[in-house]
């Protein structure tokens, strides 16, 4: 009895000692656990708030971009803008279809976009005196200069920066035909039974090449609509990729210079612009690549770039309503290229601001999550330490027995 009572007393003393020892250890852990719960709740609230605000911000940004594209000013007075200074957003590019002009450009550009099929027949009827035309050419004293001035009023449908005069000057053998300027003039004004046949055949050859280029562009446009519906980069948007791809197609089918040009470059350099501006597309998994081997390859481009040989083309991305100032409206500096530098437009600047804002939000979110993880780890370590302190004290009576 005495021994048992003594043991019981020692056990009670041990329990009291345990209470006295563990009390200052458990109390801070309990308080820190409450603090950690509040921190976790706050971190979760901030996380969902950041996601919601970012979603609303992106929606608002998309509406602003569409509003900017809708109200983008076109070239109503091209001569005045050429004198006062040109801006990138004034070029009036239609992102949906690069082969058509805006409604404000139709009237001012109607004469230059006259039907190509009637170009030779109208000139032949004018020679015969059966019809009067606003482009008067004196038949007995016709000169190559007057002949070219007449054909400068006719441009291609897809590669609209090129006129028939540009093609007659530099591309004299389309599809194996003889389309030299001297041969066309002799065919039109020789007085033979087949007057105008050579002119019509050359115009049809140019039209067929233009249609082939448009078909290739439509295939590429379907590809961009499928894989690149949204802008994929701050420095290179989808419409810039489409524009430079169209310029490359026209340079490949019609490697000729233009009369109105601000800057010249080898025609094959457009291929490098497409590689630098457009992303790399994997056709098997609908993903975009920003590194690795490009899917658009330029055969023999490096040799031609170093030697600077080959025909020169006008560095024109797109033109305005008037062909006389269309080259001034050209975006001759594309971002991310190897030889050009372009000012960031308002859309690119807004994309940059949105990207910086998203990065800032992401950094803050990562910091909160990291702080929460460290706090939870500290709480688990505190709980483990308190258990390690309690277990040896409970084993004291067993050791004494």
Curated annotation (Swiss-Prot):
The source's domain of life comes to Eukaryota
Disulfide pairs here are: none
Compartment annotation: Membrane
* Primary localization: membrane
The protein's topology relative to the membrane is: Multi-pass membrane protein
| One GO CC annotation | plasma membrane
Membrane as a keyword of this entry, yes or no, is: yes
Q: Which GO terms describe its biological process?
A: calcium ion import across plasma membrane
Q: Which UniProt keywords apply?
A: Glycoprotein, Membrane, Transmembrane, Transmembrane helix
The entry annotates sugar attachment on 77, 97, 153, 178
Transmembrane region(s): 42-62, 362-382
- What does this protein's UniProt record list under function? Probable component of the NALCN channel complex, a channel that regulates the resting membrane potential and controls neuronal excitability.
What family does this chain come from, according to its entry? Belongs to the NALF family.
Q: What protein am I looking at?
A: NALCN channel auxiliary factor 2
Q: Which organism does this sequence originate in? A: Danio rerio
